[in-house]
């Protein structure tokens, strides 16, 4: 059986580094798959056989990088922060020295004589002295990275920077040591110490800014982790004590006062309140909580005090599972990333070849070694595989994190990419378009009774039904509670299978059941036209009719059905506006299915479908060329969810359905479908923008650096500009990805 492990990686500088690690792990016997996420600095490895985590980390170490096993535990938000300072001592040193060198080189770069300029800065020996610590101390990480690539027979961005800056530095050293000889050969005795130092400093600065921006891409995870309270008020004997969350056990009872966060998942055993679940589930309205209802840890108790019996802790909690799913999605790769990986694998070697070719061409055609060295340095420095490597994962990280904020959990990056391409969506009726449980939809009484008299009938009905365990009885009780009636103590309760229930209140018999049963008991009015007409109308709508009689007289009718969710019609119309063909899937007969479909605005109805045939219906739509999403919540929906190109599970459904899905809507609100599709389109659009920026930057920058326009316009980049452009490219890609944080469905 295959196992999956997450590794935290250190030492990666660019996408080529990620490719090197991926290849190193893939060579380990027993490894089935490996995905390295450069932006997240993590690897997800599936393996079997005798392979162990230690063998995998050793493989990473041999490749020249560091790895440690990530334990699946919920960390505090502070622990997820990157402790590495944005402005390190090496960067500050580089900034100070580079500023001095740049200032000293201004007259040469501008080609003018500046009066009263301190000419000591022109001294190549001083420039050499100043540039050396930047080259070999501030820039030491580039040399270490380049040496790793030599050992592993690969090439990374560190290779390019080390080669480029070394060429400028050692060329300048040669000019400083042998100026007369070079001048006698007709070569310009210009040094480029400032170029080497400034390029290293700019790249270090770019990496620091990039690191800071990348930290923002994981803000959603830190926000989720920060929701978890650290302490709870727990009952110990006859006393209440404040303890750390880690000290709680299953079945402990905790008390949550108004305005406090609920510390754990559990069941209310005393009290009632409203709870704000928006930060966890995306549900915008407070949810009523009474005895017997479940609560989610990290949600906010609003109005009343609640005593909660702990049911889940640690990794079993809803919040922990949400965090784990978001991390899983952020560590995964979108299919488009595999295309980028193939390019970055050959990118650095290609750039080195182009740089050498530019050097040879300009030296052979002009005999100008300075020009040849400059083009070599500029090509090596301006090329940037980092921008390519960051283009996709940064957008995925922000997009999946944003989805979690709206209660949309995306398991894999591939689901984001596929959701953008959807052409059809299949909605299971029960539990998706409807509430998934019976509820009273209509109450009818013949005589013109007052509101008080109607409420009394509802109170009697709910009071009798409270003693029954039948699902229809629960619907009547819930209806009574929604009308805010209190339940009475009923005497002589009776339940007759297939007929109904009865009980006495103050000597009166109250009966609820079928018309035939009431007729057999001598109740009058069951055959009267007004009652029969209303009952027949509801039965045509596939509603269950319950007759309410007091003593020997019919008093009211109740209709019970699986009510349509209020948001269903609106969501269906919105899906159509997004260009999707909407289908309803149900086991109901055609007439019943069509009535519900007409109510919510669905034209395509797949009725009388047996549970085992749902996946086949999805497959038939796929065979017609559709990219299909399936939305469901039940066990019998799991095969169809797995068959669909994108399976979307309603979070209020079964664990089996959620496990088989690609996207989970935590709150169970259909609005989450729209959020998921709109988010996928926004994320994929952002990825394409990033890839365009990264590709166009390299496609234009490398030829310009190689001197393509020099013969026509005398245009040749300064190495400093090349370094600045390279640093800016990565920062711009990450900054563009951060725009997704403003996404609003």
From Swiss-Prot:
Keywords: ATP-binding, Cell membrane, Copper, Copper transport, Ion transport, Magnesium, Membrane, Metal-binding, Nucleotide-binding, Phosphoprotein, Translocase, Transmembrane, Transmembrane helix, Transport
CDD domains tied to this protein: HMA, P-type_ATPase_Cu-like
Record has Transcription as a keyword: no
Plastid found in the keyword field: no
Protein's cellular compartments: Cell membrane
Reaction(s) this enzyme catalyzes, per UniProt: Cu(+)(in) + ATP + H2O = Cu(+)(out) + ADP + phosphate + H(+)
Active-site residue list: 428 (4-aspartylphosphate intermediate)
Domain HMA stretches: 3-68
GO process terms (BP): copper ion homeostasis; copper ion import
Segments on the Extracellular side according to the record's topology features: 116-125, 174-193, 366-372, 565-687, 739-745
TM spans (from-to): 95-115, 126-145, 153-173, 194-214, 343-365, 373-390, 544-564, 688-707, 720-738
Membrane topology qualifier: Multi-pass membrane protein
The protein's enzyme class: translocase
Protein family membership: Belongs to the cation transport ATPase (P-type) (TC 3.A.3) family. Type IB subfamily.
General function of this protein: May play a role in the osmotic adaptation.
NCBIfam families cross-referenced by the UniProt entry: ATPase-IB1_Cu, ATPase-IB_hvy, ATPase_P-type
The protein, known as: Probable copper-transporting ATPase PacS
